[in-house]
């Protein structure tokens, strides 16, 4: 059965949430994850809802009903006016599944999988251009995680084959899950040097929260860490290009960034492990459990704005960026079941930048006092960027 919220449309999607997504100014949404994708069968989310298989989701210890799949999400993207960045499973699957999904979503009618899409109600190709080849494959928490050399070989094979199918795709390799991974830097060098010819982007992921910093002042200066992350990965991308005497730059896709109180999740995981022990257990896993529903404050909004400014200041290298997540889970939008949807504090800086920051980005020269931080030394008290829209002859100063 479709959700019964008063604002639900004919596909079961809440229109109050759709309106907030439009207000937020999101232009591209990464789907279906995230850790979730590494054990996901894309076919499970196609066809009649009543015939879709129910699976266990290893990433979040929950039951996945597959009520929403790629066809449904494509329809939602049309309602919200967003582009889809599609991630493929490199944990339990790989080359064959990626090619079959590509044929299903983008193929012209006349082949088996494209015709299956047509039978499922999507007559036109979805024309999804940007594809993530796996998610956080360096992370030991990831289903099917790999060593740098293992992933480099795998992504090279998959990217090569996908570009044989569609040369115009934009392909994103997994970079480091954070700048604090033990393999940070060496992972990027291994992957990009091996697979340079067929890659267009490398991903970056970073989350921040006050309890994870040495002080409130250090937390407010989190963008310093993001800047170092960007410059390090950009240098690795340049090394790979030079090693190949290449003809294209590998851009950065900062496709997970934001504020996440990750210590709460780490505690939840530890409790699960303690409860399960070493015994076999047969209890059912919950459906759509309430996880990672962080409630944000004013300091979080300041950090969100500063991170957005940092991404804009480095838009020559960061060509795509996606804050994580969108609704309920570490999100700017909250939606209660059978209740209202509302905006969190972090909604506002993102929405303002998305609405007004267009055109060319400039780093302004602003004289401001310095503040002392334990992690980054002296940093400017003000963080800012200027954008200029030549078409409309309008400029914007973003500052926190």
Q: Each predicted region: which residue ranges?
A:
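Non-catalytic accessory regions flanking glycosidase/transglycosidase catalytic cores in CAZymes
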Residues: 1-185, 192-201, 226-400
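Active-site His/acidic residue clusters
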Residues: 205-221, 269
